[in-house]
């Protein structure tokens, strides 16, 4: 049995869960999330705990078992607490600012990059070198953060670029002058 899949998910006090027509809906103070279930797994609610069980023991069923347990867990966490990713910008003249609903990035190119976030995600710039992305859908928050990072990934020689706050950039040593 999947080690992750067999652990029950604790249902938070503020969260409400509903299963109808193979669609699981979790709602809470921050919003509502829905997820389509695959036929290999089923979800049961009892005593404030959500358990995910699988139909058979095939390889796909075992994979879906752990996956859907974590998806349900992330949905419960998202509608109660929410998720946040933090990006750090390093480099001379590199900065970010919010212009109405657009994120304006100055990253050393000949032009500014404007990024419009999806409606489910909020972006904030507490200072010009920090970007905070928050929302209730963990996958969408991570996807938006990865898209912003892709505009200028950190380079290994000086570390200039956009990186996640918990990311460690592997640095390389530059060329050294040799004897002729």
Curated annotation (Swiss-Prot):
SUPFAM superfamilies reported for this sequence: Ribosomal protein L6 (SSF56053)
MF terms in GO: rRNA binding; structural constituent of ribosome
Keywords per UniProt: Ribonucleoprotein, Ribosomal protein, RNA-binding, rRNA-binding
Protein name: Large ribosomal subunit protein uL6
Keyword match Calcium: no
Subunit structure: Part of the 50S ribosomal subunit.
Taxonomic lineage: Bacteria, Pseudomonadati, Chlorobiota, Chlorobiia, Chlorobiales
Biological process per Gene Ontology, one example term: cytoplasmic translation
Homology family: Belongs to the universal ribosomal protein uL6 family.
Presence of keyword Chloroplast: no
Function: This protein binds to the 23S rRNA, and is important in its secondary structure. It is located near the subunit interface in the base of the L7/L12 stalk, and near the tRNA binding site of the peptidyltransferase center.
Signal peptide segment: none
GO cellular component, one term: cytosolic large ribosomal subunit
InterPro entries attached to this UniProt entry: Ribosomal_uL6-like (IPR000702), Ribosomal_uL6-like_a/b-dom_sf (IPR036789), Ribosomal_uL6_a/b-dom (IPR020040), Ribosomal_uL6_bac-type (IPR019906)
């Amino acid at each position: 049995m999947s080690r992750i899949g067999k652990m029950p998910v604790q249902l938070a006090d503020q969260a409400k869960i509903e299963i109808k027509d193979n669609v699981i809906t979790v709602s809470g103070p921050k919003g509502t999330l829905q997820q389509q279930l695959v036929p290999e797994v089923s979800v049961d609610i009892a005593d404030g705990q959500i358990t995910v069980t699988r139909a058979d023991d095939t390889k796909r069923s075992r994979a879906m078992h752990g996956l859907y347990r974590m998806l349900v867990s992330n949905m419960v966490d998202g509608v109660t607490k929410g998720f946040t990713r933090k990006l750090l910008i390093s480099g001379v003249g590199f900065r970010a600012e919010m212009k109405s609903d657009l994120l304006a990035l100055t990253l050393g190119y000949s032009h500014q990059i404007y990024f419009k976030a999806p409606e489910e995600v909020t972006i904030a710039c507490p200072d010009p070198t920090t970007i905070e992305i928050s929302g209730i859908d963990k996958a969408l928050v991570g996807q938006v953060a990865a898209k912003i990072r892709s505009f200028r990934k950190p380079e290994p020689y000086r570390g200039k670029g956009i990186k996640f706050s918990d990311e460690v950039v592997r640095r390389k040593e530059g060329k050294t002058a040799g004897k002729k």
